[in-house]
Amino acid sequence: MSWRSEQIWIELIPGSRRESNFLWAFILFFGSLEFILVGTASYLRQNLIAFFPQGMVMTFYGISGLFISLYLLSMLFWNVGGGYHQFDKTRGVICIFRWVFPGRNRRLLLRFFMKDIRSIRIEVKEGFYTRRVLYMDIRGQKGIPLTRTDEVLTPVEIEKKAAELASFLCVPIEVL
């Protein structure tokens, strides 16, 4: 989702709050609860399965799955990776904001001057896992990714996005 005017372009980044992450977190949570229940029932001498070794292994897998699902749910709650890109022509500043894990530096804010932008770069890696990533090259620094690395974009979509951004920022496009 993005908002654009003549002088300002704001693009919202969803981060970890995607439908697939919600789905996997809840499937893993309820599946691990079932494993814990079966393991506990076998420990309490219910005739589902023998406690040693099947019940112990199922309890271990249930506890492991519970921790992983709590990690995924906490990432969803904190919206890790979410934020925005703001391109402001009036001030000549680009702001890239992201939420990261809680702590002292929970907010990640990068600011650059528009005059320091060298180009908008499209990096394409073909093969079994085709990857197309849009980068912003800045003088004296590495390229900053503007799209998620796991985001699957068609060549037309990424070219359109790069062309719009390059025309808004008045910089060239590079394709690698």
Swiss-Prot record:
Listed GO CC annotations: photosystem I; plastid thylakoid membrane
GO biological process, one term: photosynthesis
Location of this chain's protein in the cell: Plastid thylakoid membrane
Coiled-coil residue windows: none
UniProt entry tagged with the keyword Transmembrane helix: yes
Top-rank taxon, per record: Eukaryota
Membrane topology: Multi-pass membrane protein
Entry's transmembrane regions: 22-42, 57-77
Keywords on record: Membrane, Photosynthesis, Plastid, Thylakoid, Transmembrane, Transmembrane helix
Similarity comment text for this entry: Belongs to the Ycf4 family.
Role according to the record: Seems to be required for the assembly of the photosystem I complex.
Record-given protein name: Photosystem I assembly protein Ycf4
Organism: Cuscuta obtusiflora
